[in-house]
């Protein structure tokens, strides 16, 4: 690899590291590269890594966030602020729903949420949510979603949400803090070089090393398009990789649509249309889907996004995958 005559760093040294905090040192660097790399990594880490957060809450007897709950010290607005601080970890980034039955007296903490689910791990169980008096009885439903950065409540609203569901702002980013510092260093007798010190703190859902690796990969994947301007196109995917992709899609097509974890409205529409498997679904065209009763543009967009996440789309010719299955 050409270094274009520039002083290249010897590597990245890990100074301190724990499950949630780490310091990384890169050097030596040409003057100016510390800020260039440090600032780019910091912005990507804060904005582009995926995480889990509560996206909506429903409390029996509560119609809006300006309500109060009998026997609960905090009003709903304060309760929501506390729920925003609850941090989750899961083996897979997927949406889920939790139900809690709470009775006073006592404190409602994130530990109660942790006990209500086997799908997610709560990383800050001591997080206070609300104070319940002796006569307090609170039934709560929580929707947990995944995303990047900060998402306002308006974007978490769904047209098929029942009355009483309150969409909330979500802080998805798993990064709590990123700071960098550029210090002078020397190479031999030359002292006009730099080293970059990058401090990363996560919420514990991923390690600082994992966070740095993901952030650097995102940067690399974007910048690589400029590198490829004068390069030959990428070679065709090897036969074995193609076979693995065919196998993956074949298995997906055989799964029931229940595996897509759709909203109630979309699920009921598919059930009414007798669409039982993902294969049945992707055979359809988008225009055809809109003809089904109670199936609107928002439901269609939900399905388009869910299929896209799995490398699928409407109007697929699934016969080649079925033929593969017969041939095997």
Swiss-Prot record:
For this protein, the parts annotated as crossing the membrane are none
Per the record, what are the reactions this protein catalyses?
RNA(n) + a ribonucleoside 5'-triphosphate = RNA(n+1) + diphosphate
Cellular-component GO terms for this entry: cytoplasm; DNA-directed RNA polymerase complex
Gene Ontology molecular-function annotations: DNA binding; DNA-directed RNA polymerase activity; protein dimerization activity
Annotated stretches, region: Alpha N-terminal domain (alpha-NTD): 1-230
Q: Where is this region: Alpha C-terminal domain (alpha-CTD)?
A: 248-328
Q: Does the keyword Transmembrane apply?
A: no
GO process annotations (BP)? DNA-templated transcription
Xref: CDD domains: RNAP_alpha_NTD
Leading EC class? transferase
User: Which InterPro entries does the record cross-reference, listed alphabetically?
Assistant: DNA-dir_RNA_pol_insert, DNA-dir_RNA_pol_RpoA/D/Rpb3, DNA-dir_RpoA, RBP11-like, RNAP_asu_C, RNApol_insert_sf
User: Under which EC number(s) is this enzyme classified?
Assistant: 2.7.7.6
Q: Which keywords does this chain's UniProt record carry?
A: DNA-directed RNA polymerase, Nucleotidyltransferase, Transcription, Transferase
Per UniProt, subunit arrangement is: Homodimer. The RNAP catalytic core consists of 2 alpha, 1 beta, 1 beta' and 1 omega subunit. When a sigma factor is associated with the core the holoenzyme is formed, which can initiate transcription.
Q: Report the function annotation for this chain.
A: DNA-dependent RNA polymerase catalyzes the transcription of DNA into RNA using the four ribonucleoside triphosphates as substrates.
Family from the record: Belongs to the RNA polymerase alpha chain family.
Q: Tell what the record comments on domains.
A: The N-terminal domain is essential for RNAP assembly and basal transcription, whereas the C-terminal domain is involved in interaction with transcriptional regulators and with upstream promoter elements.
The protein depicted here goes by the name: DNA-directed RNA polymerase subunit alpha
User: Which organism does this record belong to?
Assistant: Salinibacter ruber (strain DSM 13855 / M31)
């Amino acid at each position: 690899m050409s270094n274009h005559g520039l002083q290249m760093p010897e590597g990245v040294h890990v100074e301190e590291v724990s499950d949630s905090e780490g310091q990384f040192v890169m050097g030596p660097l040409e003057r100016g590269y510390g800020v260039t790399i440090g600032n780019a990594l910091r912005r990507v880490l804060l904005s582009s890594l995926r995480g889990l957060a509560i996206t909506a809450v429903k409390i029996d007897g509560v119609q809006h966030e300006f309500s109060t709950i009998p026997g609960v010290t905090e009003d709903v607005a304060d309760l929501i602020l506390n729920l925003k601080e609850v941090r989750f970890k899961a083996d897979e980034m997927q949406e889920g729903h939790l139900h809690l039955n709470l009775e006073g007296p006592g404190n409602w903490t994130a530990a109660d949420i942790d006990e209500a689910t086997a799908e997610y791990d709560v990383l800050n169980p001591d997080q206070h949510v609300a104070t319940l008096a002796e006569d307090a009885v609170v039934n709560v439903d929580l929707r947990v979603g995944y995303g990047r950065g900060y998402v306002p409540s308006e974007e978490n609203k769904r047209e098929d949400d029942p009355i009483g569901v309150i969409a909330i702002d979500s802080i998805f980013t798993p990064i709590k803090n990123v700071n960098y510092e550029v210090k002078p260093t020397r190479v031999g007798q030359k002292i006009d070089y730099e080293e970059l010190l990058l401090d990363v703190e996560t919420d514990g859902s991923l390690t600082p090393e994992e966070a740095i690796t993901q952030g650097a990969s995102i940067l690399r994947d974007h910048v690589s398009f400029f590198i490829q301007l004068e390069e030959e196109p990428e070679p065709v995917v090897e036969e074995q990789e193609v076979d693995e992709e065919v196998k993956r899609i074949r298995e997906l097509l055989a799964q029931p649509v229940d595996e897509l974890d759709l909203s109630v409205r979309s699920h009921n529409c598919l059930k009414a249309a007798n669409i039982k498997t993902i294969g049945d679904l992707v055979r359809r065209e988008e225009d055809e889907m809109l003809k089904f009763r109670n199936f609107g543009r928002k439901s269609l967009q939900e399905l388009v996004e869910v299929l896209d996440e799995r490398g699928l789309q409407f109007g697929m010719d699934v016969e080649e995958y079925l033929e593969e299955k017969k041939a095997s």
